[in-house]
């Protein structure tokens, strides 16, 4: 886990419906939104407020700062465990802190959404902490992690234990409903790979891989969108998926 010095550099956003403060007894589900590389999160929170207000949900959005170890590094958080910092455990600390501050928000299990770099985080959090997720939405990660025991982390899970102290609990992962989403036009070349050379191809490969291992996975291809923009449509796709499991 990270030292206290590093932990003090992490912050999180919270949204609760206005009526939270008017109710004597609170019963709220939790949605965690993970930002992408540029840390832009405001638009996703804005779009998620409608979901939260309609369905009695709270929203938590962590902010993972770049440059903690190397000044020009903005990717470490996507790996969850990197350079001695466990970003997944820092997030769980944030969620525990939120539970203390906002009684009635159920934090034992929660929904998780992320696009791009955030999608990488969600993908790997699913494998590291499946017991904490009600359902998750993995949005167009360029470097996904597959359930491949013959390839090292982060593409596969062969040495997963070296990073997290335990192997992937596949039976627990199989209990989590998974949505994979990607823009129809997100087909820009991002490098040669047996999983595909663009994000559309890689998301199809990820769905196939998950399904082959018994993970309930749906793939949504968003018409008219490439990799940027479309925050409203991406959140709406996740909302449609999540409300099945409230």
Model-identified regions with their sequence ranges:
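Short, small-residue-biased leader/transition segments that mark boundaries at the very start
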Residues: 1-6
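Serine-hydrolase catalytic machinery in alpha/beta-hydrolase-like enzymes
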Residues: 10, 20, 26-108
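Alpha/beta-hydrolase
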Residues: 32-34, 139, 182, 222
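Short beta-to-alpha linker loops that shape the active-site pocket of alpha/beta-hydrolase fold enzymes
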Residues: 63-67, 142, 225
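Short beta-strand immediately N-terminal to the catalytic nucleophile in serine-hydrolase-like folds
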Residues: 112-114, 139
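Short glycine-enriched nucleophile-adjacent loop
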Residues: 119-130
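The feature captures the conserved acid-bearing segment of alpha/beta-hydrolase catalytic domains
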Residues: 135, 142-213
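C-terminal catalytic histidine-bearing segment of alpha/beta-hydrolase fold enzymes
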Residues: 204-246
């Amino acid at each position: 886990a990270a030292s206290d010095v590093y932990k003090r550099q992490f912050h999180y956003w919270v949204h609760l419906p206005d009526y939270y403060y008017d109710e004597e007894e609170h019963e709220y589900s939790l949605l965690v939104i993970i930002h992408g590389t540029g840390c832009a999160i405001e638009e996703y929170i804005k779009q998620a407020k409608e979901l939260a207000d309609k369905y009695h949900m709270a929203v938590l959005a962590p902010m993972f700062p770049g440059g903690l170890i190397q000044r020009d590094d903005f990717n470490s958080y996507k790996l969850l465990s990197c350079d001695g910092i466990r970003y997944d455990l820092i997030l769980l600390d944030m969620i525990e802190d939120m539970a203390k501050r906002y009684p009635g928000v159920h934090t034992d299990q929660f929904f998780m959404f992320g696009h791009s770099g955030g999608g990488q985080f969600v993908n790997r959090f699913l494998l590291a902490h499946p017991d904490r997720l009600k359902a998750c939405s993995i949005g167009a990660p360029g470097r996904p992690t597959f359930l491949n025991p013959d390839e090292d982390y982060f593409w596969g899970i062969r040495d997963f234990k070296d990073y997290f102290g335990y192997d992937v609990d596949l039976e627990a992962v199989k209990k989590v409903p998974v949505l994979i989403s990607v823009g129809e036009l997100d087909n820009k070349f991002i490098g040669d790979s047996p999983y595909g050379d663009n994000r559309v191809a890689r998301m199809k490969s990820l769905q196939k891989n998950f399904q082959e291992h018994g993970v309930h996975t749906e793939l949504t291809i968003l018409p008219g969108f490439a990799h940027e923009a479309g925050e409203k449509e991406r959140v709406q796709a996740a909302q449609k998926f999540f409300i099945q499991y409230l």
